[in-house]
């Protein structure tokens, strides 16, 4: 049909959707191993076209001509965590080290999407662990957060997944993760509470068994 051909033509003529990239023109994006195949991008774009019609819009008007393509590319980026392995990322930067005090990376920016409404939630993640002969490159902690956040999520599961990945790879004496986030599904719709912030935590090892360790962690992440 004419509508489908319009969408397909836009996709076929776009190098970002034909295996050479997904969302931008820089080298990192063009070689992004997490990109989606062109046929999936085309299917997603056609679905967005249908959604636009469903809400009463005209997908053929000037301002919306490229919207299906743009939304598909955005969703591919926002869900790229499905195509990345956080444990493999951690394993690339594990080092033997005798340090045995707490390691904390706090105020890691997170952006994710609620799986119930596909609306954003965003905030900060605080990640700590106590080494047991092994440490990991600090940037890898932030990358693990990023990989799990770039999926459809609930904050509770996201917090646990970060903890479990670090625990499974490093086998530390304990892991502590706290996430504080604002959910657009509570701000833009539903109860419409603009200032609500959700806090979740997931602990293991000494962060559970030692009250002083847990207390130190929670004190350190306070503003």
UniProtKB/Swiss-Prot annotation:
Q: Which GO terms describe its cellular component?
A: cytoplasm
Q: Could you tell me which CDD domains the record lists for this protein?
A: GTP_cyclohydro1 (cd00642)
- Would I find Phosphoprotein among this entry's keywords? no
State where Zn(2+) binds: 114, 117, 185
Please provide, alphabetically and separated by semicolons, the GO molecular function terms listed in this UniProt record.
Answer: GTP binding; GTP cyclohydrolase I activity; zinc ion binding
Mind listing the UniProt keywords for this protein, alphabetically?
GTP-binding, Hydrolase, Metal-binding, Nucleotide-binding, One-carbon metabolism, Zinc
At the top of the EC hierarchy, this enzyme's class is hydrolase
InterPro entries attached here? GTP-CH-I_C/QueF (IPR043133), GTP-CH-I_N (IPR043134), GTP_CycHdrlase_I (IPR001474), GTP_CycHdrlase_I_CS (IPR018234), GTP_CycHdrlase_I_dom (IPR020602)
Q: Which superkingdom, per the lineage?
A: Bacteria
One of the GO biological process terms: tetrahydrofolate biosynthetic process
Quote the catalytic activity from the record.
GTP + H2O = 7,8-dihydroneopterin 3'-triphosphate + formate + H(+)
| Pathway(s) of this molecule | Cofactor biosynthesis; 7,8-dihydroneopterin triphosphate biosynthesis; 7,8-dihydroneopterin triphosphate from GTP: step 1/1
The EC number(s) this enzyme carries: 3.5.4.16
Concerning PANTHER family, the annotation shows:
GTP CYCLOHYDROLASE 1 (PTHR11109:SF7), GTP CYCLOHYDROLASE I (PTHR11109)
* Family recorded in the similarity comment: Belongs to the GTP cyclohydrolase I family.
According to the record's subunit comment, the protein's assembly and interactions are: Homomer.
NCBIfam families xrefs: folE (TIGR00063), PRK09347.1-2 (NF006825), PRK09347.1-3 (NF006826)
Q: What is this protein called?
A: GTP cyclohydrolase 1
């Amino acid at each position: 049909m004419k509508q489908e051909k319009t969408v397909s033509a836009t996709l076929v003529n776009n190098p970002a959707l034909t295996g050479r990239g997904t969302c931008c023109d820089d080298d990192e994006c063009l070689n992004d191993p997490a990109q989606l195949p062109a046929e999936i991008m085309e299917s997603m774009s056609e679905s967005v076209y249908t959604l636009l019609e469903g809400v009463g819009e005209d997908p053929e008007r000037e301002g919306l001509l490229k919207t299906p393509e743009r939304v598909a590319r955005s969703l591919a980026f926002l869900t790229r965590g499905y195509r990345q392995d956080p444990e493999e990322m951690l394993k690339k930067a594990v080092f033997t080290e005798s340090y045995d005090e707490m390691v904390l990376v706090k105020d890691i920016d997170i952006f994710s999407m609620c799986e119930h409404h596909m609306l954003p939630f965003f905030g900060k993640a605080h990640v700590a662990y106590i080494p047991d002969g092994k440490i990991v490159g600090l940037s890898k902690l932030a990358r693990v957060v990023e990989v799990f956040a770039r999926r459809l999520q609930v904050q509770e599961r996201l917090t646990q997944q970060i903890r479990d990945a670090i625990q499974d790879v490093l086998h530390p004496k304990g892991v502590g993760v706290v996430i504080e986030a604002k959910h657009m599904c509570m701000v833009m719709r539903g109860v419409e509470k603009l200032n609500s912030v959700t806090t979740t935590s997931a602990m293991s090892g000494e962060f559970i068994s030692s009250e002083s360790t847990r207390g130190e962690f929670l004190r350190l992440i306070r503003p």
